[in-house]
């Protein structure tokens, strides 16, 4: 695995699964506001990111549910080393196709949905 792919895996793992700025910001919101922000994100980003994040969170949470439900469940959840390792492997498949355009849409969606 090259460094760039590893960095992307690490970034996305931190983003979705640990105490990252985005997760902390989401989890600090009231539930109604959090759902509103996540719906905004869904409307303003690439569907590929949502499919990946749903799959990635589903892997960690062992739950097949909506993007919003999975993010709700992820707030406050601690993941074991084995869970993280398994999801690193799953993430690798997606990240090969994580294009610059998708990264830009993701960044813009986060900015638009939080900066209100």
UniProtKB/Swiss-Prot annotation:
- Where in the cell does this protein reside? Secreted
Q: Which domain of life is it from?
A: Eukaryota
Q: Which GO terms describe its cellular component?
A: extracellular region
Cysteines engaged in disulfide bonds, as pairs? none
Post-translational modifications: Contains 3 disulfide bonds.
Q: Which positions carry the signal peptide feature in this UniProt record? A: 1-19
Q: Which UniProt keywords apply?
A: Disulfide bond, Secreted, Signal
In which tissues is this gene expressed? Expressed by the venom gland.
Stated name of the protein: Venom protein 54.1
Upper classification of the organism: Eukaryota, Metazoa, Ecdysozoa, Arthropoda, Chelicerata
